[in-house]
């Protein structure tokens, strides 16, 4: 009988500019740690990685502080359109929804599609799926995001994206919003899964597609799993998540795979971050931006990346 594996977990709430105000940083830390604590308890109880990933994404989507689910940013026309995907590493199966509106948890639609012959749906298909699933209509708008959009409309949308995090004292004043949430889990059976969800970059052209609903930003195999956050176009151009996972599959350690991928990203002036696990339980994160809002459980304790030095950096725990 195969012995059980020590589960591992890492989550993120986006990446962007450094947080201003210690009170705000501590609020973000408490939120991330609470999610890690709840989801890790599920993993210890024996649930599989995909179930844990969905639960983690639900909790993060329900937190108005982050740009996914409740608190998603508004697009140029003032509407919220969200995207999410999940990939089961053991099955090698990806599913997702693109630009869905009026649902509380887009990750639930992505999860449902895991067992569908049509596993990635655009806006109309996602809306029809929500009706088929009898998911109640939900307004994900928050007052902070509405005021952010109104201000940008008055300024004729000078910024190219919204703030990464919705805190009155923390709302970004530069083009630095990179809001996404993601969860990567290794369960007691040694299986990996990853989920990523986003409200988009904010103020974007109608129809823009996020990396969060593509393998480029959310990818897993039986060897490794990666969730990305940052400028979606940069993530797509680097094909970041598959690049890291394939390097692990080809024999590099997770740390070396992250180091090489982020060195290339730095040279290419990319703007993003990523979190990752491998099948051996190694935990890793990387960023080219100021900060990545990540927290993890290494099997013994909870840690986070909220106070890393500014600039390109990769870290890992074996």
UniProtKB/Swiss-Prot annotation:
Keywords assigned: Autocatalytic cleavage, Hydrolase, Protease
Recorded GO MF terms: beta-aspartyl-peptidase activity; hydrolase activity, acting on carbon-nitrogen (but not peptide) bonds, in linear amides
Pfam name, any one: Asparaginase_2
Binding locations of substrate: 208-211, 229-232
Family of this protein: Belongs to the Ntn-hydrolase family.
Modified how: Cleaved into an alpha and beta chain by autocatalysis; this activates the enzyme. The N-terminal residue of the beta subunit is responsible for the nucleophile hydrolase activity.
PANTHER family: L-ASPARAGINASE (PTHR10188), N(4)-(BETA-N-ACETYLGLUCOSAMINYL)-L-ASPARAGINASE (PTHR10188:SF6)
Residues under site feature: Cleavage: 179-180
UniProt catalytic activity: Cleavage of a beta-linked Asp residue from the N-terminus of a polypeptide
Gene3D superfamilies membership: (Glycosyl)asparaginase
Function description: Degrades proteins damaged by L-isoaspartyl residue formation (also known as beta-Asp residues). Probably performs the final step in the degradation of the reserve polymer cyanophycin (depolymerizes the building block L-beta-Asp-Arg). Also has L-asparaginase activity.
Active-site residues from the entry: 180 (nucleophile)
Subunit structure: Heterotetramer of two alpha and two beta chains arranged as a dimer of alpha/beta heterodimers.
Organism this protein belongs to: Nostoc sp. (strain PCC 7120 / SAG 25.82 / UTEX 2576)
Protein name as annotated: Isoaspartyl peptidase/L-asparaginase
One example of a Gene Ontology biological process annotation: proteolysis
The protein's Enzyme Commission number: 3.4.19.5
């Amino acid at each position: 009988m195969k012995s059980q594996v020590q589960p591992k977990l890492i989550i993120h709430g986006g990446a962007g500019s450094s947080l201003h105000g210690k009170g705000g940083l501590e609020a973000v830390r408490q939120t991330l740690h609470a999610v890690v604590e709840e989801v890790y308890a599920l993993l210890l109880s024996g649930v599989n990685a995909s179930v844990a990933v969905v639960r983690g994404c639900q909790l993060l989507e329900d937190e108005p502080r982050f740009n996914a689910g409740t608190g998603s940013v508004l697009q140029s026309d003032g509407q919220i359109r969200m995207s999410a995907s999940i990939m089961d590493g053991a099955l090698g199966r990806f599913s997702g929804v693109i630009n869905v509106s009026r649902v509380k948890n887009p990750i639930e639609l992505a999860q449902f599609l895991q067992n569908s012959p049509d596993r990635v749906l655009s806006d109309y298909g996602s809306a029809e799926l929500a009706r088929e699933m009898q998911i109640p209509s939900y307004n994900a708008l928050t007052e902070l995001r509405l005021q952010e959009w109104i201000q940008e409309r008055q300024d004729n949308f000078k910024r190219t994206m919204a703030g990464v995090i919705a805190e009155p004292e923390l709302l970004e004043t530069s083009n630095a919003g990179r809001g996404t949430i993601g969860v990567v889990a290794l369960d007691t059976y040694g299986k990996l899964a990853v989920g990523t969800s986003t409200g988009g970059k904010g103020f974007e052209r109608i129809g823009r597609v996020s990396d969060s609903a593509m393998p480029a930003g959310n990818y897993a195999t039986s060897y490794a799993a990666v969730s990305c956050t940052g400028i979606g176009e940069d993530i797509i151009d680097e094909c970041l998540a598959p690049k890291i996972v394939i390097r692990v599959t080809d024999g590099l350690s997770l740390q070396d795979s992250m180091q090489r991928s982020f060195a290339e990203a730095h040279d290419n002036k990319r703007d993003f971050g990523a979190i990752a696990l491998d099948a051996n339980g190694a935990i890793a994160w990387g960023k080219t931006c100021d900060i990545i809002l990540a927290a993890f459980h290494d099997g013994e304790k909870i840690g986070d990346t909220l106070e890393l030095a500014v600039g390109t950096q990769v870290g890992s725990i074996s």
